[in-house]
Structure formats: structure tokens, C-alpha cells
Amino acid sequence: MVMLADALVKRMIEVGALKFGDFVLSSGKRSRVYVDVKLASTFPDILEMISEGMAAKLKDLEFDRIACVELGGVPIAVALSLKMKKPLVIFRKEKKDYGIKGDRIGEVKEGEKVVVVEDVITTGSSALSAARRVEESGASVAAIIAVVDREESGRNFMSLLKLSDLIEAHDSIQPTES
């Protein structure tokens, strides 16, 4: 698993998924570092590493379905669904008022155990919102897992990488000024 995490960090840095500047995160917080997992997940090899890493972390967990919130979690949840042969549900950020008018694509059945997938966790509010929606459907949350945990939530979420891992790796491959 360590080799996979190292390879994932390296590739995310290579494709420019670790950005430095002044950013406003979805939580509203400001940050000097932005982890663009959405960009990273457009590369098939990275998406495969993510799904392999998550599948390895979840292999001993009993669950029935994978859930995510649009947009960032979708490619990750789809890849994990294919890898683990589990159905998935995608929660919309907002209920649509046209077509089927639903707040989700797919279903959650009463009594199911569901894994919630996220791209990046900052405060955890998006993941916890998805978890609430799972529970409101009569199912239970088996786990919440993210590609990157920014380590700002005060909670111990399951993740493949911590923000500090990415920054440390980035700093170790940057030339130092004399």
C-alpha cells in the first residue's frame, strides 16, 4: 500500500494536481494549497491507483453500495464501483426540478451498508451531508473514504493520502536554493 501511495503522490504532482497560491475551498476556508483531485482523476492511471488503493482499504469491510456527491466524487465512485462490483448512488448537490426531479441518481435501499466516497475532505461537511442522506434512506454508513484528507476536520476519516504527505513529497522533489 505504501508503494501505491508513493506512486499516487508522484503522479498527482506530475500532472499538476497540487497547486500553490491563494484559494477559496468549497468549505469557504482560504488555503495556500489546493489539491485538484478532479484534475488528477481525468488520468486513467491515477484513477486506477485511486480505486486500487480504496479497494485495498475497504477489502475487509462489509458493505452493499457506494455513494458520492456530484461532482468530485463521481469518477472515483464509478471506478471503485467497477473495481469492487458494487452498485452506486450519486447524490446531487441540489434537487433538480426537471426530468425525473430527483436528488440522486441510483438508489439506496433500506438496511444497506454504504461507503461514502469523496475526492477531498476539508471540514467533512460534504461527506457528512452525504452520510445523512444515506441514513435518511434507511441505510447505514459503513465508512467514509477520501482520496485526500486535508486534516482540518478534527475527525479521523479514512483516506489514501493526507495533505501533509503531498506537501512533504512536493518539497522533497523541489530543488533547494543555495
From Swiss-Prot:
InterPro entries reported for this sequence: OPRT, Or_phspho_trans_dom, PRibTrfase_dom, PRTase-like
Binding site for 5-phospho-alpha-D-ribose 1-diphosphate: R92, K93, K96, E118, D119, V120, I121, T122, T123, G124, S125, S126
Enzyme Commission number(s) of this protein: 2.4.2.10
GO molecular function, one term: magnesium ion binding
Xref: PROSITE patterns: PUR_PYR_PR_TRANSFER (PS00103)
Origin superkingdom: Archaea
Pfam families named in the record: Pribosyltran
List of residues binding orotate: T122, R150
Cofactor(s), names only, from the UniProt record: Mg(2+)
Record-annotated membrane-spanning stretches: none
UniProt keyword list: Glycosyltransferase, Magnesium, Pyrimidine biosynthesis, Transferase
Catalytic EC class: transferase
Gene Ontology annotations of biological process type: 'de novo' UMP biosynthetic process; pyrimidine nucleobase biosynthetic process
Pathway involvement of the protein, from the record: Pyrimidine metabolism; UMP biosynthesis via de novo pathway; UMP from orotate: step 1/2
Catalytic activity: orotidine 5'-phosphate + diphosphate = orotate + 5-phospho-alpha-D-ribose 1-diphosphate
SUPFAM superfamilies: PRTase-like (SSF53271)
Subunit structure: Homodimer.
Physiological role: Catalyzes the transfer of a ribosyl phosphate group from 5-phosphoribose 1-diphosphate to orotate, leading to the formation of orotidine monophosphate (OMP).
Family as reported in the entry's similarity comment: Belongs to the purine/pyrimidine phosphoribosyltransferase family. PyrE subfamily.
Protein name listed in UniProt: Orotate phosphoribosyltransferase
Source organism: Archaeoglobus fulgidus (strain ATCC 49558 / DSM 4304 / JCM 9628 / NBRC 100126 / VC-16)
Gene, per the UniProt record: pyrE
